[in-house]
Amino acid sequence: MSTCTCNAAPKLIFPCSGGSDVGAVSDQAARKLTREGAGKMYCLAGLSGRVAGIMETTKSASAILAIDGCEQDCARKTLELAGFTKFAHLRLSDLHMAKGQTPANDANVEKAAASGRSLLS
């Protein structure tokens, strides 16, 4: 028998979509994880703007994953500045994906998604 998870607290994914190739990989990995049901991609800019509904949903999350493409750690810093400290952090450069040298292809997106998947489980 299956268990209803309709009222379960969400697992939220905040990628820094950035302006580079690793930003695109972060974004596409978050979308892939959302499609697979591992979590829900959510609005990083809404945290920066302290949008009430986004802040409340994030406070109620059962898990939070920040995905950053590079060492600037924009997603991590945005979460911290919004008052969140308990979250998993994935930096694509730690997976040897270098800014300006990492095409947003299926292999790189899956590599990032696999790492994110394990951090959310």
Name each model feature, range by range.
Residues 1-121:
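Iron-sulfur-associated redox domains of electron-transfer enzymes in respiratory
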